[in-house]
Structures are given as structure tokens and as C-alpha cells.
UniProtKB/Swiss-Prot annotation:
<feature type="binding site">
    <location>
        <position position="336"/>
    </location>
    <ligand>
        <name>DNA</name>
    </ligand>
</feature>
<keyword id="KW-0963">Cytoplasm</keyword>
<keyword id="KW-0378">Hydrolase</keyword>
<dbReference type="Pfam" id="PF17864">
    <property type="entry name" value="AAA_lid_4"/>
</dbReference>
<dbReference type="InterPro" id="IPR008824">
    <property type="entry name" value="RuvB-like_N"/>
</dbReference>
<keyword id="KW-0233">DNA recombination</keyword>
<feature type="binding site">
    <location>
        <position position="41"/>
    </location>
    <ligand>
        <name>ATP</name>
    </ligand>
</feature>
<dbReference type="Pfam" id="PF05491">
    <property type="entry name" value="RuvB_C"/>
</dbReference>
<feature type="binding site">
    <location>
        <position position="85"/>
    </location>
    <ligand>
        <name>ATP</name>
    </ligand>
</feature>
<protein>
    <recommendedName>
        <fullName>Holliday junction branch migration complex subunit RuvB</fullName>
        <ecNumber>3.6.4.-</ecNumber>
    </recommendedName>
</protein>
<dbReference type="GO" id="GO:0009378">
    <property type="term" value="F:four-way junction helicase activity"/>
</dbReference>
<dbReference type="GO" id="GO:0005737">
    <property type="term" value="C:cytoplasm"/>
</dbReference>
<feature type="binding site">
    <location>
        <position position="86"/>
    </location>
    <ligand>
        <name>Mg(2+)</name>
    </ligand>
</feature>
<dbReference type="InterPro" id="IPR036390">
    <property type="entry name" value="WH_DNA-bd_sf"/>
</dbReference>
<dbReference type="InterPro" id="IPR041445">
    <property type="entry name" value="AAA_lid_4"/>
</dbReference>
<feature type="binding site">
    <location>
        <position position="87"/>
    </location>
    <ligand>
        <name>ATP</name>
    </ligand>
</feature>
<feature type="binding site">
    <location>
        <position position="238"/>
    </location>
    <ligand>
        <name>ATP</name>
    </ligand>
</feature>
Length: 356
């Protein structure tokens, strides 16, 4: 399977010091340099760990389309970042035996970008559009007839002399990935024949991902070490693979070994200030402010943002979701409130009750 990529715009959200978060779900700058042929990516449904229900649905659809000799129905994959939407799209292309054209919505701002993508498409090829919810209205409307009727409707000329020209295109599969499916227009959503959600991974699946990745980069990791890593990666494979690379770096420099035990994992991640629940310094500062200055809340978002020197949108979309996921934070009509579990964890992991 060939992969053609035109992704030019991904962003990871840094903290207020301009540093990228090791446990953030978005791609880091170093990861942007990795191609879609990253050695840790699964190449088949069998290699893809987790998401068992999703895999079953897609395996059936892929096998049925191959049996009929037809293009797979258009597919929308949605869910939090870092769970494998891009990887799943590439696996599908591999299973179909077709080329994958990989792009993102910011690279498709102008009509000619859409036309350029579709005009040379080959029968049954797969187009993957990341962040598809960011497509503007004109780009979405250009895709409507392409997805439904396999044609491009182009306006030729200007003013009174303008006319509509339709160009037929071969059957193809559009795979759209999004963290915000509701941000897509209703007509756009309706044109996807298959819509599937990716969920956060359980500890067992994450352990298996970590073991698989360790083997691929020639590491020997103990059972206890893989369990410890799984607890710290926030249910997200992207973070799991990122952490195992950092642990590898630490082991090679300090242990001069490719054997990873639980002590190496703890030492490496303590150095990066990632605790046993996957919280980093930003998370602990957030909880610490609530616990130490506001007795656990409730506190308004803007007040917290001012106290931390962070943007309120960053807190709401990057910091808070994981804290809510693990039961450390409640959003109420009166403001943010930390739970007893959050207070207990904070007091245990911050000796002076303040994360400096």
C-alpha cells in the first residue's frame, strides 16, 4: 500500500512556558517528523490492539466490499485525540490493498485543494482527512456530490457567463477523523455510510500495546514495568508509545541497557514529572490551586486560568477532560470542584502540598 501525505498543520498544545506536554494527547513536534510509515503503527486488523467492537464492524465492511469489488462506504471515525483514528484509516487501506491519500482539513481550505485531491483519484482509493470538522462550508459543499454521486461540480467562468461543469470521478472511500463530530454540517455527516467512535483503552490493551511497541524497538520490558507504564498513559496509545520512547532514552543513558524494569520506568517518568496516575506538573498545579487556595472549590474557570497563568480554553479542552475522566474533577453550575480522590492523590504526591 502506498501512502501519499499532505498533512501540513497539526498542533500540540504547549503549556504557558511554551513547553509541549509529554502526556498531552496531541502530536508533539518530534512526532510530526515521523511519517505514516512509523514502525510502531499496526499494519493490519490483527496487529491493531484494542477497539474490538470497532474492528469487528470494519472487518465485516472491508471483507464485504472486497467480495463485491466495490469501494468501501465513506467512514467517519470520531473520539478523543491519540486513540488511533489515523492508524485505523491506514490499516483499512492496507486491508483493501489500495493507496491511502492522507491530508487534513487545514490543507483543504480552497476549492482547488479539493479538486486537486479528487481529480487524480484512482478507483477504490482511500482519502483520509484529519480534523474534518475544520473544513469550511465551501469545501464541504464541494464534497457532497463527490461523496454521494461520484462527481465534481465546478463553476467555470464568472458573472453572467459562468456555467456549471460536472466531472465524473471513480468510486473512492473518504475516511474523516474528528474529535468534534457535532461541528460537521448535518448534510456532511449524513454522507458517511459508517460512523464509529474510538474509546479510551483499558489497562490490559495498553499493556499489550506497550509490549508490542517495546518488541518493535528492541526493548525487553518486564510485566511489572509494562503494567506501571499502562497506568500512566491516560488510556491513550499515542501517549503510551511516547512514554516508552522516553523510558528507552533513560535506560540507554543511565542503565546502558535495553532491559526495562519497573525501577527504570519509575525513575524515567519521575524525571519527566509524570506520576502514577498519568498527571503531570500542569495537572497537579491545577489541583493544587483548587485545594490550597480555594478549599477544593467551587471556583470559576476564569479565576483558575488567571491563577495559573493559562488560557481558559486550554484548561477546559486539554487539562480538565482527563481529570474528569478519572473522577478527580466535577464541573458544576457554580464552578470547578475537586473530588476527595483528587485531594488524597494530591496530598500523597506533593509532600509540601504545593507542586513547585
Amino acid at each position: 500500500m502506498a501512502i501519499v501525505s499532505s498533512i501540513t498543520n497539526h498542533s500540540s498544545l504547549p503549556n504557558d512556558k511554551g513547553e509541549e506536554r509529554l502526556v498531552g494527547p496531541s502530536l508533539l513536534k518530534e512526532e510530526l517528523k515521523l511519517s505514516q510509515q512509523d514502525s510502531l503503527r499496526p499494519k493490519s486488523f490483527d496487529d491493531f490492539v484494542g477497539q474490538s467492537e470497532l474492528k469487528k464492524v470494519l472487518e465485516i465492511s472491508v471483507k464485504a466490499s472486497l467480495k463485491r469489488g466495490e469501494a468501501l462506504d465513506h467512514l467517519m471515525l470520531y473520539g478523543p485525540p491519540g486513540l488511533g483514528k489515523t492508524t485505523m484509516a491506514l490499516v483499512i487501506a492496507e486491508e483493501l490493498g489500495v493507496k491511502a491519500r492522507v491530508t487534513s482539513a487545514p490543507a483543504l481550505e480552497r476549492p482547488r485543494d479539493i479538486v486537486g485531491l479528487l481529480i487524480n483519484i484512482q478507483p477504490r482509493e482511500l482519502i483520509f482527512v484529519d480534523e474534518i470538522h475544520r473544513l469550511n462550508r465551501i469545501s464541504q459543499e464541494l464534497l457532497y456530490p463527490a461523496m454521494e454521486d461520484r462527481r465534481l461540480d465546478l463553476t467555470v467562468g464568472k458573472g453572467t457567463s459562468s456555467r456549471m461543469r460536472s466531472i465524473e470521478i471513480p468510486p473512492f472511500t473518504l475516511v474523516g477523523a474528528t474529535t468534534k463530530p457535532a461541528a460537521l454540517s448535518s448534510p456532511m455527516r449524513d454522507r458517511f455510510g459508517i460512523t464509529q467512535r474510538l474509546d479510551f483503552y483499558n489497562y490490559l490493551d495498553l499493556e499489550n500495546i506497550i509490549k508490542r511497541s517495546a518488541k518493535l524497538i528492541n526493548l525487553v520490558i518486564s510485566e511489572e514495568a509494562s503494567q506501571q507504564l499502562a497506568k500512566r498513559c491516560r488510556g491513550t496509545p499515542r501517549i503510551a508509545n511516547r512514554l516508552i520512547r522516553r523510558v528507552r532514552d533513560y535506560a540507554e543513558v543511565y542503565s546502558h541497557s535495553k532491559k526495562i524494569d519497573v525501577e527504570v520506568v519509575n525513575d524515567a517518568l519521575d524525571l519527566h514529572r509524570v506520576d502514577q496516575r498519568g498527571l503531570d506538573a500542569t495537572d497537579r498545579s491545577y489541583i493544587g490551586l483548587l485545594v490550597n487556595q480555594y478549599q477544593g472549590g467551587p471556583v470559576g474557570l476564569e479565576t483558575l486560568a488567571a491563577g495559573l497563568g493559562e488560557d481558559s480554553t486550554t484548561l477546559e479542552t486539554v487539562v480538565e477532560p482527563y481529570l474528569m475522566q478519572i473522577g478527580f474533577l466535577h464541573r458544576t453550575s457554580r464552578g470547578r470542584v475537586v473530588t476527595p480522590a483528587a485531594k488524597k492523590h494530591y496530598l500523597l504526591t506533593s509532600p509540601n502540598n504545593i507542586d513547585k
